[in-house]
């Protein structure tokens, strides 16, 4: 971006930013990015982005804890996930942005809220990167049963190599990311469809697996739907939330997608059947095919199934697919955090180096920063390889819930302003309106309570917020003045509804819907440097 002249050698933060040369006050968030994603890629990203380690690896331990009730839990969380995605879809049609819900939080609640939601989202994906790298390392060691070479590779070394290679691929171009995700998603989808086809065959023809006939009788013979009680079944909810992490990626890709108005609704509308088939359908089949006790903590339940039926070569092939799923999730996380950090950087909420975009349209610094945290996972895998996955999964789940809450809150505020005549809704609208948003937030609050009951990992994860919250407060007060200066350069506001740093200052708006409102039409308070809040 251009630099304002300043006679003082100590330039302020605002000197490095200029008022956007457009009526769109958020145009600066998109500078340097390329429209490198087409409908084919986005459709596949929407279908396959959230099919990752949560489903392929985490389901094994969840089945052990919750039993067959896990399928119902997947359906319930899938319903709320769909509501979240429809709300995000309406916000995207309102204004596409690579900053996704962080940019919408900035528009509707101001810079402080954007700072918190942005850094929590980054924490989510940074921890997901650790979980994915850990999962891949576990998957690779599985091949030790066939070749001692794989058994001898330290888990931390596999995680290190995975992080380095994935970061390097993400730094090339958005087009390469789109192609990688297209093929990753296609492999995952074909693998799940293959599993379901084989599983349905065994179910329909009653073919025994390890001497046990699959079907509903299998559930009855193994203590019913709640084999370990109701509370253990409910406590796994946060792990299932992690399995759905990534559905919001379609929002981050919107800023680099061609023909958004047509592509985004079509992509989001595929989600409901994706949830029904790939999540609820596959988990239901797992429950009907084998006893819940047959599944293991550190092994994909899909691999367990193919191992049990004894068809030579199917288990290793599925294990390779599972590695692909984890690599896809890691790839998507690096992509997403790079764009989110860029959006925060141009607003002053993240270090200025995160605004750097390469000639190929890649936010290099933001991706590298997340990659560095991914290397933290290497250390974690060195010291506590057995617990590494569960620890970071719980932390990432908290970040996912914070992201979903930010989307719901932004959407309900947007609809409130629509009701006041300050915005016009697109034709593609979220069902249920503001009621759906409040229902989502109530559900997320319940999940947090259940997470607190999951002693020790869940309890300690929530207790870690006692460290995260003070860090966020310190971070905000560290960057607040810079954020204020940059906001003033952008005409003193962060969105169509004027907000100085973190405080709405509008007394009066014109009655007809507008996409941009001139500062002259507004009555502003506190014209001096804002004190923040």
Which functions belong to the PLM regions below?
Residues 37-56, 61, 162-165, 219-280, ...:
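Hydrophobic, membrane-embedded alpha-helices of multi-pass small-molecule transporters
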Residues 195, 202-203, 391, 395-403, ...:
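A generic transmembrane alpha-helix motif of multi-pass inner-membrane proteins
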Residues 1-60, 64-69, 82, 86, ...:
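Membrane-interface "cap" regions at the ends of multi-pass membrane proteins
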């Amino acid at each position: 971006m251009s630099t304002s002249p300043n006679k003082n050698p100590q330039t302020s933060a605002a000197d490095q930013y200029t008022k956007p040369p457009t009526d769109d006050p958020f145009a600066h968030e998109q500078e340097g990015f390329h429209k490198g994603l087409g409908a084919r890629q986005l459709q596949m990203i929407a279908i396959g982005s959230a099919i990752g380690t949560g489903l392929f690896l985490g389901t094994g331990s969840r089945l052990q804890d919750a039993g067959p009730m896990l399928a119902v839990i997947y359906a319930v969380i899938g319903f709320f996930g769909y509501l979240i995605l429809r709300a995000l879809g309406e916000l995207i049609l309102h204004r596409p942005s690579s900053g996704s819900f962080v940019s919408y939080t900035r528009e509707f609640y101001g810079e402080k809220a954007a700072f918190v939601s942005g850094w929590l989202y980054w924490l989510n994906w940074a921890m997901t990167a650790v979980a994915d790298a850990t999962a891949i390392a576990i998957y690779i060691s599985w091949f030790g049963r066939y070749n001692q070479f794989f058994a001898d590779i330290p888990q931390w070394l596999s995680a290190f190599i995975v992080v380095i290679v994935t970061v390097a691929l993400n730094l090339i171009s958005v087009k390469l990311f789109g192609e990688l995700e297209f093929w990753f998603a296609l492999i995952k989808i074909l693998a799940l469809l293959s599993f379901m086809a084989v599983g349905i065959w065994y179910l329909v023809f009653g073919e025994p697996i390890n001497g046990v006939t699959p079907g509903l009788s299998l559930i009855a013979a193994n203590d019913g739907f709640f084999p370990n009680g109701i509370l253990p079944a409910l406590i796994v909810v946060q792990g299932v939330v992690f399995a759905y992490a990534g559905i919001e990626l379609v929002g981050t890709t919107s800023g680099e997608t061609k023909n958004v108005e047509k592509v985004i609704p079509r992509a989001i509308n595929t989600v409901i059947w994706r949830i029904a088939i790939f999540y609820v359908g596959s988990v239901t089949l797992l429950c009907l095919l084998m006893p819940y006790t047959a599944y293991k903590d550190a092994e994909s339940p899909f691999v367990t199934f193919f191992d049990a039926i004894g068809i030579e070569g199917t288990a290793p092939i599925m294990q390779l697919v599972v590695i692909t799923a984890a690599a896809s999730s890691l790839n998507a996380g690096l992509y997403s955090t790079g764009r989110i950090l860029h959006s925060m950087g141009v607003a002053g909420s993240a270090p200025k180096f995160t605004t750097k975009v390469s000639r190929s349209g890649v936010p290099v610094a933001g991706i590298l920063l997340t990659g560095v945290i991914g290397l933290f996972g290497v250390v974690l895998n060195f010291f506590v390889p057995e617990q590494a996955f569960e620890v970071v999964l719980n932390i990432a789940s908290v970040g996912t819930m914070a992201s979903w809450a930010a989307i719901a809150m932004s959407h309900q505020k947007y609809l409130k302003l629509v009701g006041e005549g300050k915005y016009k809704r697109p034709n593609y609208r979220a069902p249920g309106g503001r009621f759906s948003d409040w229902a989502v937030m109530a559900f997320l609050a319940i999940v947090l309570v259940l997470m607190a009951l999951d002693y020790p990992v869940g309890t300690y994860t929530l207790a870690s917020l006692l460290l995260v919250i003070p860090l966020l407060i310190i971070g905000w007060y560290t960057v607040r003045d810079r954020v204020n200066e940059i906001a003033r350069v952008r005409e003193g506001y962060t969105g169509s509804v004027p907000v100085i740093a973190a405080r709405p200052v509008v007394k009066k708006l014109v009655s007809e819907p507008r996409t941009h409102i001139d500062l002259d039409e507004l009555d502003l308070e506190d014209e001096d440097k804002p004190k923040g809040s």
